[in-house]
Amino acid sequence: MAIAQSDSEDSELEEGETDLIYDARIDNLCSFLESEIHPLYSLVRSLKKGVAFHHGGLLDVARLEVEDLFVDGAIRNLVCTSTLLQGVNLPADRMIVISPKIGDYELSHFDFLNLIGRAGRINTSLYGEIFCIQLVDEEWAEDKIESNETKEIQSSVLRKLNEYSESVVSYIDVYTEDIIDAQGDLKAVTLASYLRSQFLVDREHYDKIISNSNLTSNQIRVMTNRLEALEDVLKVPKDIVYKNPFIDPLLIDQLYFLVESEGVNKWMIDKYPRVRSGVADPNVEFQFMNYYNQYKSIVTRLDDIFGIEKEINYKEDGVSRKSSYYVSIFKLVNDSHKWMQGRNYRFFIDDMVTKKLTSKGISVDYKKIDGITNFVTTHINTNLTFILVKYLSLWADVVSSFMTEEERTLNAFFLNLSSMLEMGSYDPQVLEVMAYGINRSTAIELLKKQKMKSEQTTWQYLMQYNLDRLSPLHRKYLQRAGFGSSKPA
């Protein structure tokens, strides 16, 4: 779909004239994207033509800047996905809807009305214009606009439970691996795992889900009996399951058993990432390894239990691929380590361009850069800072449960690996700056351009920061957070 702002009066351009609006913020955003993403990134090229695009996979800074520029009228035309339906407040004077679908799914009447409700601005326009583009033999607009369809609100959990009720009941106490071996219905596996978790840590919520479902009384009885029996044999403390409700309790229990039987020392990293210590050989005993190999050992053993690589690469059916680019567990380890070292998106994009294109003699153009960029942003925002973070957080919960309070304090750095990965840095100073509401790329740039003095607190460093050292975009985000000084520090 596309949305646009209109001039107060229609006018025809003279030959050689342009209606492009010059705004230094557009140049600043283009410079940032060329540095952080790639000079051939399509958003750079389109911004220079007065058009932007907007979708959930955009870099956070780029998405926020595009929204600001559109709202302020510096960008008049915006091509976007269904992010408009997901809380992004971008009203427009004119909207063009080119398809009644979100991806492969038909846009519901409710969502369509929500979408077209973005046309018009409460402060400046009493109405907006909506254009629905339809092809011959594919008429849809009139039906959408005139439909009296009502929407019944139902949680996705209930909808899936009613759809896969028999499978969920059968799988409620069965390991995923056994279901796969039996060629069972993988679409019911995640829901069965979630219901196991809710039964163990929030029985009231579990009962509410079940009572509102279409399960028969016999199915409910069978599920309850199996879950009660399961509860009796699990060793993992309930508070660990409670903290990790979207990970299968059966597998959490398996991890807990391994840590308990093998000893915490076999599961606890004790080398620091920015210190040369330990052996680089990955085949030595765990306690002799350097940091990177200890980290790799932990993640690969977590993968053996939880199937992280499969979760990243395959859809819920266990067969369809999420992306044409496959992410091995070793790539996940290496990329997450590089991300915590402070590498930016451009580093990962350039690495893929080299490996997938230039080394194979394939020409580099904007379409290929866009495809790689979309993969890298999804890889970082989903695979690294969501999926892997989820399992590293669980790992920390499990190993710390065997420690004394003093041992937890001594190992605090390693137990916070999930937070470091989510925020994207091993560097305590970067993390401290980010804690003041500064985005990652700006925080890294600040410390690169001006070191923090030993006698300074983080707050003093930010307040006294010399704004002249920064590019306009980074300067803007520092000032927006209430920091920075025009005088040299």
Q: Where in the sequence are the language-model features?
A:
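N-terminal nucleotide-binding beta1-loop-alpha1 segment
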Residues: 87
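Short, ordered loop/turn segments at secondary-structure junctions
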Residues: 83, 100-101
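Conserved segment of the helicase C-terminal RecA-like domain
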Residues: 90, 94, 101-151
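C-terminal helicase module of SF1/SF2 nucleic-acid helicases/translocases
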Residues: 126-225
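C-terminal accessory/interaction regions of large nucleic acid-associated machines
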Residues: 175-202, 212, 231-489
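Conserved C-terminal RecA-like helicase domain
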Residues: 1-77, 92, 103-110
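Ser/Thr-glycine-rich phosphate-binding loops at phosphate-binding pockets of nucleotides
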Residues: 78-84
